[in-house]
């Protein structure tokens, strides 16, 4: 199940117009450092703050380099030049990737729509041109999903949950809010799953997906 359109390894992005949020985010990805010099500013002898070597820690009567003051508990999440180079090369192919994903999604949609009862498919808006991450399948019940997912997996077609669904039902987040306030997210957790539409699917792979779905239909009819 290759899901992502392109990859540069692990990573992500934070976007904000709030300078305080930007500064904190930069600190978190850089070991929790207090220094906010960016790019060529890292080469300035006195730093962006103009007081790089100062008494930064209360109670200590000597100067410390601001680049080595840690104001937050942070992480080492800085992207590598190699990751950027890989991403740039993949961006050159993004139009082809987008086109093939749309073609594959349309084909797989039809396989499910023509053969499987108890499901709904996700359609894009009239003016949209979605670059599909996968093929979302909405089932009429948890039982329908469990049965269909099990059959696909047993026949070597990988599936994925629709991410967390309602994150508030998960152990790490259950104390944050009342999950019942978000009924749509609960439905997603209970009834929705993905199959892939990666552009790397060959014609024979697409045909195999169709064959498995047809066999599922026949197996249901014979019970």
Predicted regions mapped to residue ranges:
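Glycine-rich phosphate-binding loop of ATP-grasp-fold ATP-dependent ligases
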Residues: 9-14
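Conserved active-site segment immediately N-terminal to the catalytic lysine
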Residues: 1-8, 23, 68-69
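PLP-dependent aminotransferase class I/II
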Residues: 17-223
């Amino acid at each position: 199940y290759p899901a992502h359109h392109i990859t540069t390894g692990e990573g992500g992005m934070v976007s904000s117009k709030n300078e305080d949020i930007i500064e904190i985010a930069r600190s978190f990805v850089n070991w929790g450092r207090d220094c906010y010099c960016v790019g060529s500013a890292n080469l300035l002898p006195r730093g962006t703050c103009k007081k790089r070597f100062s008494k930064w820690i209360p109670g200590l009567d000597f100067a410390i380099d601001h680049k080595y003051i840690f104001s937050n508990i942070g992480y080492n999440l800085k992207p590598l030049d190699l990751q950027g180079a890989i991403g740039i090369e993949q961006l050159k192919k993004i139009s082809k990737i987008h086109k093939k994903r749309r073609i594959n999604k349309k084909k797989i949609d039809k396989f499910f729509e023509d053969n499987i009862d108890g499901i709904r498919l996700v359609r894009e808006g009239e003016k949209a041109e979605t670059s599909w991450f996968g093929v979302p399948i909405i089932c009429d019940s948890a039982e329908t999903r469990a049965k269909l997912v099990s059959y696909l997996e047993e026949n070597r077609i990988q599936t994925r949950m629709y991410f967390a669904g309602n994150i508030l039902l998960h152990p790490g987040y259950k104390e944050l809010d009342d999950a019942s306030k978000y009924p749509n997210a609960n439905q997603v957790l209970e009834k929705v799953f993905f199959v892939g539409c990666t552009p790397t699917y060959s014609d024979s792979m697409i045909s195999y997906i169709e064959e498995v779905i047809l066999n599922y239909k026949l197996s249901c009819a014979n019970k």
